[in-house]
């Protein structure tokens, strides 16, 4: 699976903000649904908190959609 780097200009970003910033998902409702279905993983582990703080190097994978790495500018 190819991982796309998404650059942020802060030290950390919340999961829900990151997915919207990356253009992966448009709303918090979409994120909540995917979390409830256990389809989002952070660094290979199933994620359950939409406000989880992400840092450069973290990889987010959504089953059936792709993978994105938090990168720092």
Regions found by a protein language model. Name each.
Residues 1-13:
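A detector for short, charged/polar N-terminal pre-domain segments
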Residues 14-56:
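A basic, amphipathic helix-loop patch mediating RNA/tRNA/ribosome contacts
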Residues 12-15, 62:
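Generic detection of intrinsically disordered/low-complexity segments and helix-coil linkers/edges
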Residues 3-5, 37, 59:
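Low-complexity, intrinsically disordered short peptide segments enriched in small/polar/basic residues
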């Amino acid at each position: 699976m190819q991982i796309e780097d998404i650059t942020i200009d802060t030290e950390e970003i919340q999961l829900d903000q990151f997915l919207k910033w990356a253009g992966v998902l448009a709303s918090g409702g979409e994120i909540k649904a995917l979390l409830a279905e256990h389809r989002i993983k952070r660094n290979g582990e199933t994620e359950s908190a939409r406000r989880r703080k992400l840092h450069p190097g973290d990889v987010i994978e959504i089953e059936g959609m792709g993978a994105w790495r938090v990168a720092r500018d």
